[in-house]
């Protein structure tokens, strides 16, 4: 069990959600096809879209959990090289996002299987649902960079770099 937790901690990087908080708010950044944002003052991103339409990045996350969510970066310059497009942003209260990287409420321990840990589409799924019952988003890492997965529809705005 100790080895599992140590490996999980290696899986996540050192930055915490608080590093991105400014006066209790976190800026979130999302890239989309430029056609989706052309001439619009704002868009509403709906996590249900993730269920039916996924890019390569989202497909990997889909294998981990099929729980509906929209992905955001906490730093628009710190993204995978493959990610491009029109940049959108929004700000949300930090306290609406659960910091899974530090896991202060022990969700990982609560949901992990005693032998197999957090299995894709199993414990990950129930853990996301449980976190969503108290939070609107979750901060974690799927390698590098860190992301916020938002569980609810959210209004976003065009963002100039």
Please place each PLM-identified region on the residue numbering.
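Active-site and NAD+-binding cores of ADP-ribose-processing enzymes
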Residues: 16-65, 79-161
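Soluble catalytic regions of membrane-associated enzymes that act on cell-envelope
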Residues: 76
């Amino acid at each position: 069990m100790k080895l599992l937790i140590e490996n999980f901690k290696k899986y996540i990087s050192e930055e915490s959600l608080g590093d991105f908080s400014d006066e209790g708010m976190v800026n979130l950044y999302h890239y989309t096809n430029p056609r989706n944002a052309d001439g619009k003052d704002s868009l509403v991103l709906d996590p249900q879209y993730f269920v039916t339409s996924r890019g390569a990045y989202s497909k990997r996350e889909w294998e981990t959990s099929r729980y509906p969510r929209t992905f955001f970066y906490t730093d628009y310059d710190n993204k995978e090289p493959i990610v491009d497009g029109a940049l959108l942003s929004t700000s949300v209260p930090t306290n609406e996002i659960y910091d899974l990287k530090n896991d202060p409420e022990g969700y990982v321990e609560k949901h992990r299987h005693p032998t197999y840990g957090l299995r894709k589409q199993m414990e990950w799924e129930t853990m996301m649902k449980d976190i969503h019952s108290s939070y609107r988003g979750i901060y974690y890492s799927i390698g590098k960079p860190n992301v916020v997965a938002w569980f609810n529809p959210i209004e976003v705005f065009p963002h100039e770099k």
